A protein has these predicted regions:
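Conserved ABC ATPase "signature" region
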Residues: 64-69, 110-126, 176-177
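ABC ATPase NBD coupling module
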Residues: 66-84
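Conserved ABC ATPase signature
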Residues: 129-133, 137-139
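Hydrophobic anchor residue at the start of the ABC signature
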Residues: 143
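A short, proline-enriched helix->beta-strand linker immediately N-terminal to the Walker B motif
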Residues: 148-152
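Catalytic Walker B motif of ABC-type/P-loop ATPase nucleotide-binding domains
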Residues: 154-158
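Conserved H-loop
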Residues: 183-190
């Protein structure tokens, strides 16, 4: 069970707004995050991952407290079993495609790494550096690097926005396999959630 109650003020060039999110979610759920542009969906992800500390709130995962502002409890990002994919991909420029994916795989299991290289049509690019990749190719690498971590909670911020339509469905299928195979809870911000029609989506509006 994942439980959170978060309140956080966001400052923008046009003023400020309040992000307020409260929910209880069953482990292994697939959650589609929706809301107006600029409302704070990415900020919410950063709070879950431990990158940002909210003004007020708590986060509990299976009764373990990740965050409790009232009692000054904060589990650092590196100690949370959470993987996150940002819209800017954040690939390591001095690492090849394969090295970027392998870096995130703590067991360095070559079979798992090769699995995602094949499934995301990256095998032919495994020795290429990010600067030589298109936006869609970089996005596929970033998604593979996120999924290969086998995290308890997976946060995906527009993971398919730059991917060719011909690959989008197969990549969505790989995302959906994570649920039954390892029981991860997936939160996804995406305009392509309709491609996941074979799974029961829970919608969280921010």
């Amino acid at each position: 069970m994942i439980e959170f109650n978060i309140k956080h003020q966001i400052f923008t060039s046009s003023g400020s707004k309040f992000l307020e999110v409260s929910e209880m979610i069953e482990k292994g759920s697939f959650i589609h995050i929706s809301g107006d542009s600029g409302i704070g969906k990415t900020t919410f992800f950063k709070i879950l991952a431990g990158i940002i500390t909210p003004d007020f709130g708590f986060i509990k995962v299976n009764n373990s407290i990740l965050l409790d502002t009232e009692n000054r409890i904060f589990l650092p990002a590196q100690k949370r079993n959470i993987s996150i994919m940002f819209q800017n991909y954040a690939l390591f420029p001095n690492m090849t495609v394969k090295q970027n994916i392998a870096f995130a795989q703590k067991d360095k299991n070559p079979e798992i790494i090769d699995y995602y290289l094949e499934k995301f049509n990256l095998k032919i690019l495994e020795n290429v550096f990010p600067s030589k990749l298109s936006g869609g190719q970089q996005q596929r690498v970033a998604l593979a690097r996120t999924l290969v971590q086998n995290a308890e909670i997976i946060l995906l911020d527009e993971p398919l926005s730059a991917v060719d339509a011909s690959l989008r469905q197969s990549m969505m299928e790989e995302i959906l396999k994570i649920n039954p195979n390892q029981g991860s809870t997936i939160f996804m911000i995406s305009h392509h959630a309709r491609d996941s029609h074979n799974v029961s989506l829970n919608n969280l509006i921010i």
